[in-house]
C-alpha cells in the first residue's frame, strides 16, 4: 500500500507474470479479444475523459486500501471469496476503455460496500486473534536503552516483533491503532 520503489514493484510484477504463465500457460499467445494477454497501460487512465478518469481513480484507490485490509486479515487466516472476486471485477472495470459512467458508477458504489465487508473481516480477524480493544493508559516516557519504533497497522508484525525481542532489553514503541 505504501511501497513506491520502482525496483521492488518491477520484481512483484515479474512474480505475478511468472505465476500467470504457470496458471494459464496459453494466455500470452491467445488471440481472444478479452485483452488479458497484454499488460494494462496505466497512462491511458490519466488521459481519458475527466469524469471517467475520476470514477476509475475512485475504484483504483478504493481497492488499493481494501487490498491492505484483506492482506492483514488473510495473514491471520481470514479470507472472504466475495472480497477476492471483487478485486478482479474492479480491475476489469478499470481496464475497460469503452465503459461509461453508467457502468462505472455502480462499481464505485460497490467498492464502498465490499470495503465495508473487508473492514468487518479485518475486525473479526483482529478481535478473534488479539481480543477486543479497550481504552488503556500507556506511558509516554522513553526508556533508556535500545529501541524499535513500529508503525502502521499490521498487528501480526507487532506480535512477532514483541516475541522476538522478549527479555532482550529492547523497548518497542508504537502509536495509533497498534496500541
Task: Provide a role label for each language-model segment.
Residues 1-179:
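Metallocofactor- and cofactor-centric catalytic cores in central/energy metabolism, strongly enriched
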